[in-house]
């Protein structure tokens, strides 16, 4: 095992952290209709909590409206209730076997709350990235103690860990700035 092996094991984990962050912020409202808004909604169905995607299809009708096509007609009211109770500030209205979800414009105060939430998710992701870097450095130091690599290799490995961290933190910061712009856009 060498420094390259450690780096090759760490990089995919850092990529996964970025992907998890992207998934997390996709559900934050920006004032535009997007199916990701309802990703976290759980519906009480058949005696258990099920993701909305498992009880119906979600589609975008227009910029301010989502349409949820519920597969089982008996689940329409439970689905409508789940969307209303999800604390997303959305206004669902049953229409036969489907539900129209109106997305009201965001207030300035609500936009700022969503920006704060985005930054919080970003900070959590940065902590994860730093922990991965720390683990990588720890593994490299362990290799040096076991005499599997030289001190020069250890130093190069630490430098590579720092560079990898900076690369992924930059990606994360770019995503945060992009999401903030999206949220604050009126």
UniProtKB/Swiss-Prot annotation:
As for subcellular location, the record says:
Cytoplasm
Source organism superkingdom: Bacteria
* GO BP term (any one): translational termination
Q: Any idea which GO molecular function terms this record carries?
A: ribosomal large subunit binding
| Pfam families named among the record's database cross-references | RRF
Question: What keywords tag this UniProt record?
Answer: Cytoplasm, Protein biosynthesis
Q: Which InterPro entries match?
A: Ribosome_recyc_fac (IPR002661), Ribosome_recyc_fac_dom (IPR023584), RRF_sf (IPR036191)
Q: Does the keyword Acyltransferase apply?
A: no
Cellular component annotations (GO), alphabetically ordered:
cytoplasm
Similarity comment text for this entry: Belongs to the RRF family.
Main function: Responsible for the release of ribosomes from messenger RNA at the termination of protein biosynthesis. May increase the efficiency of translation by recycling ribosomes from one round of translation to another.
Under which name does UniProt file this protein? Ribosome-recycling factor
Species of origin: Chlorobium phaeobacteroides (strain DSM 266 / SMG 266 / 2430)
- Taxonomic lineage per UniProt? Bacteria, Pseudomonadati, Chlorobiota, Chlorobiia, Chlorobiales
